[in-house]
Swiss-Prot record:
It comes from the Eukaryota. GO terms for molecular function: metal ion binding. Pfam families: C2. Residues 123-144 are annotated as: Disordered. Phosphorylated at Ser-40 by CPK18 in a calcium-dependent manner. Ca(2+) 1 binds at residues 20, 26, 73, 75. The gene is ERG3. Residues 1-103 form the C2 domain. This is Elicitor-responsive protein 3. InterPro entries: C2_dom, C2_domain_sf. Ca(2+) 2 binds at residues 20, 73, 75, 81.
Length: 144
C-alpha cells in the first residue's frame, strides 16, 4: 500500500458567485481528504476572486481517491454561506508525483459557480522512514 504526504497548494479562485449582496464576500476554503479536514484563512473582503497561496499537508494512502474543497463565505452574526465545491481526483497524483497549479470547476447544485486553482504534490513515505524492516511487513519474523 502506497502511503505518503499529499501537499495541496491552494492558490486562489476566480468568478465565484458573490453570496453577500451588500458588500464583497469573505471567502475561505475547507479542504477534506477522507477523514482529514483543514481550513484556509479568510480572504477578507476579497469577493469573487480571492487569493490564498496557502499550503496544506495531508497523510494519505493510495485508497484516498479524491480531495474535496468546499468554498464558504464567512459571515459574522449568521451562519457562513456555502459558495460551491470542487472535487479533485487523486488517482493521477500517485503516478505523476506532482500536478502544477491547475484550474478546477467550482460547482453548487450541479451548476458552474466559478473556478479554483490548486497544485498537488505527493511524496511517498519510504518504509525505512517509518522504522519498519522488511520482516515487519507482511511476513513471518524469525524468532531466535
Amino acid at each position: 500500500m502506497v502511503q505518503g504526504t499529499l501537499e495541496v497548494l491552494l492558490v486562489g479562485a476566480k468568478g465565484l458567485e458573490n453570496t453577500d449582496y451588500l458588500c464583497n464576500m469573505d471567502p475561505y476554503a475547507v479542504l477534506k481528504c477522507r477523514s482529514q479536514e483543514q481550513k484556509s484563512s479568510v480572504a477578507s473582503g476579497k469577493g469573487s476572486d480571492p487569493e490564498w497561496n496557502e499550503t496544506f499537508m495531508f497523510s494519505v494512502t493510495h485508497n484516498a481517491t479524491e480531495l474535496i474543497i468546499k468554498l464558504m463565505d464567512s459571515d459574522s452574526g449568521t451562519d457562513d454561506d456555502f459558495v460551491g465545491e470542487a472535487t479533485i481526483s487523486l488517482e493521477a497524483i500517485y503516478t505523476e508525483g506532482s500536478i502544477p497549479p491547475t484550474v478546477y470547476n467550482v460547482v453548487k447544485e450541479e451548476e458552474y459557480r466559478g473556478e479554483i486553482k490548486v497544485g498537488l504534490t505527493f511524496t511517498p513515505e519510504d518504509d525505512r522512514d517509518r522504522g519498519l524492516s522488511e520482516e515487519d511487513i507482511g511476513g513471518w519474523k524469525q524468532s531466535s
